Amino acid sequence: MKRLGIFALALLTAALTTGSVSAQAPIEGELTLITPVSKFIHDAALKAFAEYAKEKLGASVKVNAIPAGTPVAYGRIVEWKGKPEADIFWGGESALFEKLAEQKLLQKVEISKEAWDSIPASIGKPKPIPLKDKDGFWVGTALEPYGIVYHPKKIQRLGIGEPKEWDDLLNPKLKGEVAQCAPTRSSSSNATYEVILSMYGEDKGWDWLRKLSQNTGHFTARSRDVPTVVAKGEYSAGFAVPSYMAFEEKLAGFDIKYVAPRNAFVTPEPMAILSGARNPKAARAFIEFLLTERGQRVFMERGLFPITPRYKVQGPAGSTAEMAVEFTGGVRSYFDREVSNVYDEAVATKRSEALKTKFRSDIEAVWKKP
């Protein structure tokens, strides 16, 4: 009888211990992203989150990323049909997130009200850029302009001024000196093609894009490769480059400059939780972490800008944050400046396939390296 009592006590102790461990694990022990966001950013974000989860939540989280260009990532999510191999989709145009939500392939983010309310509904005029989904299926994480990257010494040798506006890329002296990624392969290129079409109208816009292709010496396989070939001095300028990709080359020691022309599209780097995600609690915790000052600092130190007016890019003299401010023209927050935007999400969504088809027929099919 005494042995039975000891055995029962042992079972009760084990049950209580197990319950205690469960109570101390508020989130799952794994998190996987599928993302076009470069390793430079997503590795830092995942590492910072894992440290935060251990420190603040008492949880050991194994973090993983599936790198994929935006069109490829979108296609894989559709193919998974609600049984995803990742928990989160991060990066690209918000129009794609809207399409995934329509197909019921996203679940609502359902983060805390404080975190949700810290992000304004939109930014920019005359066309506001949504910074979060009105129906709650995605949320912005950082502001990222798509602009022009250039090699100052090569530009100087060509005898032209440093580019400031999109039209500067059409200078005849830049023939064969521009690098870009096809809009069929890159969301930043696709969005910037949309900007040009919105600025000039369909006919004049395509004329402009054809002229750009005549100055293009290389169509890269990925948008990430555009600043790399410019930084190495293989080309003088790059079109539709995300700010952080250019800054990564600057940190690597290359002589490279960056400018966001008027009407440069500013993406909120959307993030969403996939329907059927195996680790939804960890996914929500990751999103909430990224919206804290600690999470936003991951971006602010790497050439991106805060998604909330609460924070500004700043740091000690000589810090990477201050280097980023200088590199991006003195910008500390996009909420402190006028943001001119002509990109229309509804038009972009409707025109998406037609744009890609016309690019293939009017530019890709006839392009020859100058």
Where would I find each of the regions flagged by the language model?
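Early extracytoplasmic/lumenal segment of secretory-pathway proteins
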Residues: 24-99, 227
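Short beta-strand->loop
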Residues: 34-37, 132-143, 150-152, 158-159, ...
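Short helix-initiation/N-cap motifs at beta->coil->alpha
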Residues: 66-75, 95, 167, 213-228, ...
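Ligand-binding "clamshell"
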Residues: 100-108, 133-134, 248-260
